[in-house]
Amino acid sequence: VGNSQVLTCTRKSNVAMVTWKINPKVGGPCTLGYRADQNKTDRTNCSDSMNWKFRPDRDPALEIRQVGIAHEGNYTCEVVATDGNFHDVYYLTVLVPPRLTLYCDDHGNPVCEAAAGKPAAQVLWVLGSNFTPEEEGHDNGTVTVLSRLTAYGTNLTNTTCIVSHPAGNQSKSIAC
């Protein structure tokens, strides 16, 4: 999320037409088209964040700027050339790194929160095995994972929470 993504498309000489057909999971479909005989591009229902990376007659790659969760979905590039029709199909999955927060609750137990990640993060504790992770799903497809380490009267001088996620791992330590 937040980065730019370029989806490549088959490069051919003698291209007659190139079409990107985009079907996101959220919102309606959009298309980007190019006709060589008129040297004309056209767009239907596409946001400004999606456009040709370069000139479509030279390189038909699609660039998505500031990728968001709404961009997740199917992307198909169709190239019509003198030597045939060519298709490139992608499914764009958007990863959202969670926000890591570590604090002590009212009972002196460390609580680790991996907020609004996509997919849900895995929360683990260094030198701690008695914890209960809870997941809360959000409307935008992200998930918050909350894990409370129960010490049962043991004084945890320094506890480390590790958050494992496809967008990157994080860790924080705290003394409660």
What are these regions (language model features)?
Residues 1-6, 103-111, 144, 156:
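Short coil/turn motif common to extracellular beta-sandwich-like domains
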Residues 5-7, 70-79, 108, 121, ...:
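Conserved Ig-like domain signature around the intradomain disulfide
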Residues 5-7, 60-62, 143-149:
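Short strand-edge motifs at loop-to-beta-strand transitions and within beta-strands
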Residues 6, 47-95:
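Ligand-binding face of N-terminal immunoglobulin V-set domains in extracellular IgSF glycoproteins
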Residues 9, 20, 75-78, 92, ...:
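Core motif of extracellular immunoglobulin-like domains
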Residues 12-49, 117-135:
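N-terminal V-set
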Residues 24-28, 56, 81-106, 127-133, ...:
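Flexible inter-domain hinge/linker segments at boundaries of tandem extracellular adhesion modules
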Residues 51-58, 102-104, 136-143:
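Short beta-strand segments within Ig-like beta-sandwich modules, predominantly Fibronectin type-III
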